Amino acid sequence: MKKQNWLLLLVILLLPAESMIAKKKTEKSDREIWCEIMYRMATPVLKNMSDGLLKQNMLVELSPTWDGRNKEVTYMECFGRLMAGLAPWLSLPDDDTAEGIQREQLREWALNSYKQAVDPAAPDYLLWRQEGRTLVDAAYIAESFLRGYDALWMPLDSVTKQRYINEFTQLRRVDPSYSNWLLFSATVESFLRKAGAPSDTYRISSSLRKIEEWYVGDGWYSDGPRFAFDYYNSFVIHPMYIEALEVITEAGKREKIGNMPGCNYHEAIRRAQRFGVILERLISPEGTLPVFGRSITYRTGSLQTLALLAWRNWLPVELSNGQVRAAMTAVIRRMFGDGRNFNTAGFLTLGFNGSQPGISDYYTNNGSLYMASLAFLPLGLSADDPFWTDASQSWTSKKAWEGEEFPKDHSYHKK
């Protein structure tokens, strides 16, 4: 009897240890979490579009205040925005890991989808020739080529490439609004320039000089003549400004655009670094972000500038790899961990955290929401990059609210 009791006690004592070992074995790494969510987000779009079935199978959701424009803009928004976020990940070399197999599959679907997008005879030919809105999402497609030039642009056949050049060129018919839209023209023309096609340098240079004029200080640009407090500095302005500058100044080798001073590539990166510091400090200890400004349904797209800094190895000294990864993972898990942001067909649903169509703007459909993919740019870093391998660290607000030492904040001024 005593022997049985001792055995029972031993089993009870060992159970927690075995449970902890099992938990450790099944606990996913931050990168695995990101890959899983990105794959889930991308698969319904690319799998369907690669077969010419996106328009047929996408469960489309429109804002209750939809302004009546052609709802087929949905498909271009969905594809373009997704690819702008996905391009760096798909640019990694193939390998035989579980992630590598998924990545190779997504790239295959993506390359087929790119062909569908510009083939007038294809069922998923996108809405290139109608609606001024087309300029916006053509710019995200162009941005995906800038971000994944060798992996996504170069493998396309010559007919498909020429079709893209033709479609991008005819978008000069669109007169961009006096706002962040100037960067959409600049991005399209910057890609044409990089691809060796005829480009309109004035559309690039005039847009960049205007954005430069709209810099208001401390890492913030005004979205047009009047400042608005929203996330458009992350959705559009910092990333597209830097990427267009990178093309036209040859990554800072040229100090001027034409005969005009200003628009300094390296200074633009420093401003983005300051904005990245601000974004990191906005992430709460619980992994939430403040909900303010228009287009809040773009969810994690608000983190794009921070994601860009991490992917390009431009994080400022104030931010470590471990704290940025931990902070971004906390937001991504909080936003997508329970699946509530996907509809019954697997596409993103209108809302911020769940189905909340009432908060969407008059121009918003659920294709618009694939801006969320822009937070996943660091997946373009290999799995052994320090961003992924450095030890996880508490981010600024978590340290502050837990009573730990944390760095003071300082405004940024050009030196």
Locate predicted features.
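Aromatic-lined, polymer-binding surfaces characteristic
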Residues: 75, 86-89, 103-255, 261-269, ...
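Long, charge-dense tracts
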Residues: 98-99
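Bacterial Sec-dependent N-terminal signal peptides
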Residues: 1-25
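Non-catalytic carbohydrate-binding regions of carbohydrate-active enzymes
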Residues: 263, 267-361, 390-394
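Low-complexity, Ser/Thr/Pro/Gly-enriched N-terminal "stalk/linker" regions
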Residues: 23-78, 84, 88, 108-115
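CBM-like carbohydrate-recognition segments
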Residues: 47-70, 120-123, 331-415
